[in-house]
Regions:
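A shared catalytic/ligand-binding motif for oxyanion handling
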Residues: 1-259
Length: 259
């Protein structure tokens, strides 16, 4: 299964619409989550009305010219059931066509508030989106220092829900203010969080930052195979590796060596 998430910062521009369609053709995601569409669900459906493959769409309408959250999925490859809609979260059960294994999927825009966290029970979850929050100062370069209280609250939510923060193999920052020199600010605002019970299997999993020239956020792609056999995996992915502070450095080193 391939899932991408992207804060596109508005889809009224024809140029952004063309670029998004090109990304869909290139990346071929089964599921795509889009934040800040800044348009209505109906307009989003009109934009993709003649696009092939024909993606199904569920969305929160933008409020005026702000906000908007959408999930697109290819019904020939993925089945969705039991939609839950909250102000900043869209979630559903999903599975690959032909598979008997359901995974709960949630697209997020902004850090979940305490009441919204109740949708993350002790079940297999893949949570993705623009959380607009970092877990530590190492995830930000430049700009005003985030408060420890906010970062700790976000980290506590991840730990309490037994989610694992998946690192991207080709970089850290997913947002940049597009300014140079000492005025540049970059942060890791977008991410995939996956339940430990999903991670602690013999699976293939990889997250990567993609090009995204029409927004100040970059798209992120997650590739996950819940049924990968031992022959397909040279080792078992363990959740506790991601709690090692040196893990990100190791991953970046492996990535460079593979080039």
């Amino acid at each position: 299964m391939i899932i991408t998430t992207w804060n596109i910062r508005g889809m009224n521009s024809k140029g952004k619409q063309r670029y998004l369609k090109e990304r869909l053709r290139r990346d071929k995601p089964n599921i795509m989550i889009i934040q800040e569409t800044k348009i209505s669900e109906q307009k989003l459906k009109d934009i993709f009305g003649k696009f092939k493959p024909h993606y199904k769409i569920i969305a929160h309408d933008a409020i005026g010219s702000a906000g908007g959250l959408a999930i697109l999925w290819n019904p020939e490859e993925v089945q969705f059931e039991d939609l839950v809609s909250l102000p900043r979260i869209l979630s559903s059960k999903s599975r690959n066509i032909g598979s008997q294994e359901w995974v709960l999927l949630a697209g997020v825009y902004g850090p979940p508030i305490p009441g919204e966290r109740k949708i993350f029970p002790d079940k297999p979850w893949i949570v993705e989106g623009d959380f607009n929050m970092i877990t530590s100062l190492s995830e930000q370069r430049g700009g005003l220092r985030r408060t420890n209280t906010d970062m700790e609250a976000f980290g506590d939510m991840i730990n309490e829900q037994r989610l694992v923060d998946i690192p991207t193999i080709n970089g850290t920052h997913t947002w940049n203010n597009r300014r140079g020199g000492t005025h540049q600010i970059a942060s890791r605002l977008d991410r995939f969080l996956i339940s430990e019970q999903v991670i602690n299997r013999d699976i293939f999993i990889e997250a990567m930052i993609l090009p995204g020239m029409v927004s100040d956020h970059w798209p992120i792609k997650l590739e996950i195979d819940l049924k990968a056999s031992p022959k397909m995996r040279p080792f078992r992915f363990e959740a506790f590796w991601l709690r090692d502070q040196k893990f990100m450095t190791k991953v970046k080193g492996w990535w460079r060596q593979s080039q």
